[in-house]
């Protein structure tokens, strides 16, 4: 039979664990409220964009006219594609990062190139010779300028003929 001292220590340990768990619950509840608020703030924008796109798409010509919409065919038949790889900055996204990297490595050929956004993707692909550029932007404050920074290299490589498609 356990001594009363051991029982008291065990009870205190359980109470401490309960306090920590409660604090974690409060923090996660606060973060969830903040995420829901952010979602509600951007929802009208995305709804409007979806509605606008759904009105415009039926009026587009059958054949896209801009060269960015065409995948160039190479004489050897093996196009050089660029993949914009979006991963998290930390490994706290469940299996998301692993699934993205697994799909990338299944789809990519030896001639393809990777533009990686996120620290997890960079750490996984940093020794891969197909890595062209990595972007260490945090996801906390996305901006139009960051989006331009990310796409300018891929667009320039496409225009110069180094790439035949961007995915």
Predicted regions and their residues:
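Conserved loop-to-helix interface motifs that mediate assembly, gating, or partner/ligand docking
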Residues: 2-167
């Amino acid at each position: 039979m356990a001594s009363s001292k051991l029982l008291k220590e065990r009870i205190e340990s359980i109470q401490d664990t309960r306090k920590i768990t409660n604090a974690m619950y409060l923090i996660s509840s606060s973060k969830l409220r903040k995420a829901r608020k952010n979602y509600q703030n951007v929802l009208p924008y995305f709804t409007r964009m979806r509605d606008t796109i759904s009105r415009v798409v039926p009026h587009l010509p059958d054949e896209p006219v801009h060269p960015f919409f065409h995948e160039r065919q190479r004489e050897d038949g093996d196009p050089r594609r660029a993949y914009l790889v979006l991963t998290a900055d930390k490994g706290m996204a469940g299996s998301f990062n692993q699934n993205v990297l697994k799909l990338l490595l299944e789809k990519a050929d030896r001639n393809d190139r990777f533009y990686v956004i996120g620290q997890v993707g960079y750490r996984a692909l940093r020794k891969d010779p197909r890595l062209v550029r990595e972007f260490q932007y945090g996801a906390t404050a996305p901006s139009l300028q960051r989006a331009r920074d990310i796409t300018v290299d891929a667009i320039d490589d496409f225009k110069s003929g180094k790439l035949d498609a961007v995915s």
